[in-house]
Amino acid sequence: MNEMTHRTKTRPVKVGNLTIGGNNELIIQSMTTTKTHDVEATVAEIKRLEEAGCQVVRVAVPDERAANAIADIKKQINIPLVADIHFDYRLALKAIEGGIDKVRINPGNIGRRHKVEAVVNAAKERGIPIRIGVNAGSLERHILEKYGYPTADGMVESALHHIKILEDLDFHDIIVSMKASDVNLAIEAYEKAARAFDYPLHLGITESGTLFAGTVKSAAGLGAILNKGIGNTLRISLSADPVEEVKVARELLKSFGLASNAATLISCPTCGRIEIDLISIANEVEEYISTLQVPIKVAVLGCAVNGPGEAREADIGIAGARGEGLLFRKGQVVRKVPEEIMVEELKKEIDVIAAEMAAEREKEKETQEQ
């Protein structure tokens, strides 16, 4: 069996101003729920996704109206835009003409060779990558006849079939996804894909469900895949506001130490010793730090005796008690604060540390560019 390609050894592929694959951080993606031809609504949703930390966004392009809207949408957003195309190569060409940053299309499904060539040539001319989207629920008939039902081997065979079509046209800016709604099937498919080729992998558990069930299912499946060193970009698919997809993705990547641009909350599970409303405080602080683009760790704890010591790794935190709380940095108490202003004081400290971290990052960036 071939050796598995670790995410850092995959081919780097440019998507707009980002690079997916190679020694680059995992990229968080989502997809809009609006009608793409409704430019105003689509842009508004993308803006909310940007604010939540989405780095690449995909839009459905089911018809010419949607394809014609791409150029207007592109002008008003700040993150790379992906066109989701099914079957009609002309829609892919229109999207590319409109300035799309990536096309999701399966070359084997869009007809004769001249149609595939037209899309590949247009993408090549503009430096636009193609994502091959293999889905267990829509495998080719000959593959289902061969294997009897969706299998990981069948999914990899499908991916290799589409990859070969592009490679035969000397096109190599390829990203591949191997999505299934069955968690075990998805894990096996991604692992076998990582052994079969070195193109970047887009991770996802498709049709995973509602906010609660889908979050659990996606975390179980994608967590196992990420832990194997597989995956260069991901989308959490939920039957929910797409902003929730981004939030879950950020938390998942943070859990594996794979996100350097997101804040982390540490909070205790509560017990009978607690004398403050810790749950509402933790939720308020979590919401406050949710859009920060720096790796600050914030602790909210309910026990002034054990709290600071239990969260030594936190950059800043509070340990509450009735009447007053302790404000601490890296496990060391900074000062006591009255309970009624405890959260506001914590927010002020968070702002200071986040600004320091952002300035430090800019300084490092300038040094690297010199």
Swiss-Prot record:
Needed co-factor(s): [4Fe-4S] cluster
Catalysis: reaction(s): (2E)-4-hydroxy-3-methylbut-2-enyl diphosphate + oxidized [flavodoxin] + H2O + 2 H(+) = 2-C-methyl-D-erythritol 2,4-cyclic diphosphate + reduced [flavodoxin]
Pfam families: GcpE (PF04551)
GO terms (BP aspect): isopentenyl diphosphate biosynthetic process, methylerythritol 4-phosphate pathway; terpenoid biosynthetic process
Cofactor: how bound: Binds 1 [4Fe-4S] cluster.
Pathway info: Isoprenoid biosynthesis; isopentenyl diphosphate biosynthesis via DXP pathway; isopentenyl diphosphate from 1-deoxy-D-xylulose 5-phosphate: step 5/6
GO molecular function annotation: 4 iron, 4 sulfur cluster binding; 4-hydroxy-3-methylbut-2-en-1-yl diphosphate synthase activity (ferredoxin); 4-hydroxy-3-methylbut-2-enyl-diphosphate synthase activity (flavodoxin); iron ion binding
Residues the entry annotates as binding [4Fe-4S] cluster: 268, 271, 303, 310
Highest rank taxon of the organism: Bacteria
EC numbers for this chain: 1.17.7.3
Keywords associated with the record: 4Fe-4S, Iron, Iron-sulfur, Isoprene biosynthesis, Metal-binding, Oxidoreductase
Function: Converts 2C-methyl-D-erythritol 2,4-cyclodiphosphate (ME-2,4cPP) into 1-hydroxy-2-methyl-2-(E)-butenyl 4-diphosphate.
Family per similarity comment: Belongs to the IspG family.
PANTHER family: 4-HYDROXY-3-METHYLBUT-2-EN-1-YL DIPHOSPHATE SYNTHASE, 4-HYDROXY-3-METHYLBUT-2-EN-1-YL DIPHOSPHATE SYNTHASE (FERREDOXIN), CHLOROPLASTIC
Protein name per UniProt: 4-hydroxy-3-methylbut-2-en-1-yl diphosphate synthase (flavodoxin)
